[in-house]
């Protein structure tokens, strides 16, 4: 069997007018031969378009399906040439075992290795997501949470909400006199859900032992990984005038082991985090929510004025949400519902569907891009009203109304091909939509048809700036 090829979406970008779409994700594909040229399927192209639309939207999760006999290209008659004979471009056959896509090639490879060991997409996703928390700790990790969309081999769907929840002591006006407390320190952290979310996924869908799928991340944290450009950039962004990476001993152990911050290409190890993951691998997910790991987490948060308790950790449970679904140019697209923004992504696609000539020719690329931009602006306006269905009245009604044809047609009528509009046109309520700092997205599929799309985050870069000294866990600031 040939070794899996690592394919970056950048290998595809420069071959077509879709080169406006940028992605750093790395895709590992497990296959048996490489005789065919790489032909991206529509299921790869649509998430790429959505990534352009919603790079800043948290929890964008889409799974696309289409009729078996459908040869329809979803962007009409203009088909980009992905078959350039340039020898420098990657080529690969469709995977025989499946495929895993994450932001880091090491983590994608961990997922494929799990597939090769007899695991399925659920096992692979757990391995890759935990790895991302090791390497891309600036925006993801077990101190945070996320949302998953699962498509089973029999084409049923499930949304797993493992977002952080507010501690029991939280109250409505707790940040009224200190808004920074929602961003930095112990009060900024919600109860982490990532481990419970991965536990739910693995126990319901996985086939390999839990310890087996956790071990790759343990080894990556212990043996080390190269410092990349993203980590350098985010350290520079977060350090500020007082460089806590070097001056705070808790952080310096990992980020400045020699007294100065790590540089590009250096090998970074996270031994405390490796020990933490190893304990979770050996004793199970509950080791995160009780015992030493939980106790040290609560101590660290309370030392930074937090109110989270062991009871908050022990009482955490995942939530199962409804799916959102549309038909788009003959394809069925499934996404998540509130509190994530899946319905907004679908709304944008429905607006774009009204343009029959979207990307029809190379000459229409600029106009089509403008239309996408305008649809996104209106989408962001509607996004400001989304909230947690448990605490926001009539959220299901709002989501369903967002996708009715009359709403789509009304939005289309407001879009001009010749200009943009005043901000009030997109968001009449005048609510400010701040830039969202970043999340990590992973997709895993296997040869049974099981497909899982997951978005995880600790919210802002380096979360609440609270690291648990004993475990190396970086806590989220999701209360913001």
List the predicted regions and their residue ranges.
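A short acidic/small-residue loop/turn micro-motif
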Residues: 165, 459-461
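Flexible, polar/acidic helix-loop-strand segments at domain edges
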Residues: 343
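Short, low-complexity, Lys/Arg-enriched N-terminal segments of secretory-pathway carbohydrate enzymes
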Residues: 1-45
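N-terminal signal-anchor transmembrane helix specifying type II single-pass membrane topology
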Residues: 30-69
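Noncatalytic scaffold domains of N-terminal-nucleophile
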Residues: 51-52, 63-283, 288-340, 413-419
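Internal maturation/activation junctions in enzymes
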Residues: 78-79, 357-458, 471
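A short, polar/charged loop-to-alpha-helix boundary motif
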Residues: 170, 461-476
């Amino acid at each position: 069997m040939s070794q899996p090829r690592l394919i970056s979406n950048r290998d595809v970008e420069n071959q077509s007018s879709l080169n406006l779409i940028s992605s750093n994700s790395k895709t590992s594909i497990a296959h048996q031969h490489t005789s065919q040229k790489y032909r991206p399927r529509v299921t790869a192209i649509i998430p790429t378009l959505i990534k352009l639309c919603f790079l800043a939207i948290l929890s964008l999760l889409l799974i696309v399906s289409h009729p078996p006999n459908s040869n329809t290209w979803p962007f009409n008659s203009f088909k980009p040439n992905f078959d350039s004979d340039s020898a420098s471009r990657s080529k690969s056959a469709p995977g025989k075992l499946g495929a895993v896509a994450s932001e880091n090639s090491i983590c994608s490879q961990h997922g494929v290795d799990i597939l090769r060991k007899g695991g399925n997409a659920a096992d692979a996703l757990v391995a890759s997501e935990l790895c991302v928390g090791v390497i891309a700790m600036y925006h993801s990790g077990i101190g945070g949470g996320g949302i998953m969309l699962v498509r089973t081999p029999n084409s049923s769907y499930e949304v797993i909400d493992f977002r952080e929840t507010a501690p029991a002591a939280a109250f409505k006006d707790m940040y009224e006199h200190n808004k920074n407390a929602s961003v930095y320190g112990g009060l900024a952290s919600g109860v982490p859900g990532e481990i419970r979310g991965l536990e739910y996924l693995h126990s319901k869908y996985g086939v390999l032992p839990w310890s087996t799928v956790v071990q790759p991340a343990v080894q990556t944290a212990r043996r080390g990984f190269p410092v990349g450009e993203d980590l350098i950039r985010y350290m520079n962004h977060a350090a500020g005038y007082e460089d806590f990476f070097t001056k705070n001993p808790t952080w310096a152990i990992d980020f400045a082991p020699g007294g100065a911050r790590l540089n590009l290409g250096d090998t970074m190890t996270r031994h405390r985090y490796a020990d933490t993951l190893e304990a979770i691998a050996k004793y199970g997910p509950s080791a995160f929510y009780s015992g030493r790991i939980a106790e040290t987490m609560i101590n660290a948060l309370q030392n930074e004025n937090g109110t989270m308790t062991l009871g908050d950790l022990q009482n955490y449970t995942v939530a199962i949400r409804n799916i959102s679904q549309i038909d788009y140019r003959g394809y069925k697209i499934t996404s998540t519902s509130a509190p994530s923004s899946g319905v907004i992504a679908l709304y944008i696609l429905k607006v774009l569907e009204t343009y029959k000539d979207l990307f029809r020719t190379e000459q229409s690329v600029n106009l089509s891009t403008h239309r996408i931009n305008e649809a996104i602006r209106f989408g962001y306006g509607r996004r400001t009203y989304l909230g947690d269905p448990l605490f926001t009245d009539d959220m299901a009604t709002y989501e369903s109304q967002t996708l009715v044809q009359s709403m789509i047609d009304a939005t289309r009528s407001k879009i001009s091909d010749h200009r943009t509009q005043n901000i009030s046109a997109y968001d009449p309520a005048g609510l400010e939509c701040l830039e969202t700092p970043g999340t990590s997205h992973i997709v895993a599929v296997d040869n049974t048809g099981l497909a899982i799309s997951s978005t995880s985050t600790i919210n802002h870069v380096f979360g609440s700036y609270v690291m648990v000294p004993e475990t190396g866990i970086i806590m989220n600031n999701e209360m913001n």
